[in-house]
C-alpha cells in the first residue's frame, strides 16, 4: 500500500485508519472487545493488523459479518429505546423508575444517585 488510505466506513461509522483493527471496531456502538475479536476470527484477520493494512475485500467481509450477525449503531439504540418505552407503557416498577428519572436497579436514593436525579434542588429556609 502506498500513501494514506481513505477512511474505512463500517456500519455508518468512520473507523480510524492508524489503529489496530481490534481497537478500531470498538468505535462502533454495540461492538466491544469480545465482539470485535469474534468478528476478526470469523473473517480470519490477525488481531494485530492495522486498519490501513486491510484490503478493500477484507473491509467488505467485516462489513458483511457485522450487518449479518450484529445489532449495532442506530438499530441497537432504537431497540434499547423501544425496550425502555415498553417498560414505561406497561407501568411496571422498572418503567415507573425510568419515567421518574430514578435509579432502576435497586440502588439507594437517600444519598447519592445525583447523576440520575440531576442537580440538587435548593430548599428555601433550609439553613442551620
Curated annotation (Swiss-Prot):
Domain of life according to the entry: Bacteria
Pfam families hit by this protein: Ribosomal_S13 (PF00416)
Region (Disordered): 105-128
Keyword Cell inner membrane part of the UniProt annotation: no
Annotated keywords: Ribonucleoprotein, Ribosomal protein, RNA-binding, rRNA-binding, tRNA-binding
GO cellular component terms given for this protein: cytosol; small ribosomal subunit
InterPro entries: Rbsml_uS13_C, Ribosomal_uS13, Ribosomal_uS13-like_H2TH, Ribosomal_uS13_bac-type, Ribosomal_uS13_CS
MF terms (GO), sorted A to Z: rRNA binding; structural constituent of ribosome; tRNA binding
GO biological process: translation
Family: Belongs to the universal ribosomal protein uS13 family.
NCBIfam families in alphabetical order: uS13_bact
Subunit and partners: Part of the 30S ribosomal subunit. Forms a loose heterodimer with protein S19. Forms two bridges to the 50S subunit in the 70S ribosome.
Known function: Located at the top of the head of the 30S subunit, it contacts several helices of the 16S rRNA. In the 70S ribosome it contacts the 23S rRNA (bridge B1a) and protein L5 of the 50S subunit (bridge B1b), connecting the 2 subunits; these bridges are implicated in subunit movement. Contacts the tRNAs in the A and P-sites.
PANTHER family for this protein: 30S RIBOSOMAL PROTEIN S13/40S RIBOSOMAL PROTEIN S18, SMALL RIBOSOMAL SUBUNIT PROTEIN US13M
UniProt-recorded name of the protein: Small ribosomal subunit protein uS13
Gene expressing this chain: rpsM
Amino acid at each position: 500500500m502506498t500513501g494514506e488510505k481513505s477512511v474505512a466506513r463500517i456500519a455508518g461509522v468512520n473507523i480510524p485508519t492508524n489503529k489496530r483493527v481490534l481497537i478500531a471496531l470498538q468505535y462502533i456502538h454495540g461492538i466491544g472487545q469480545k465482539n470485535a475479536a469474534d468478528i476478526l476470527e470469523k473473517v480470519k484477520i490477525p488481531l494485530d493488523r492495522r486498519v490501513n493494512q486491510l484490503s478493500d475485500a477484507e473491509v467488505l467481509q467485516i462489513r458483511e459479518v457485522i450487518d449479518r450477525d450484529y445489532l449495532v449503531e442506530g438499530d441497537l439504540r432504537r431497540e434499547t429505546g423501544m425496550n425502555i418505552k415498553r417498560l414505561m407503557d406497561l407501568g411496571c416498577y422498572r418503567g415507573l423508575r425510568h419515567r421518574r428519572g430514578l435509579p432502576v436497579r435497586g440502588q439507594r436514593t437517600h444519598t447519592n444517585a445525583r447523576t440520575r436525579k440531576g442537580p440538587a434542588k435548593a430548599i428555601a429556609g433550609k439553613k442551620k
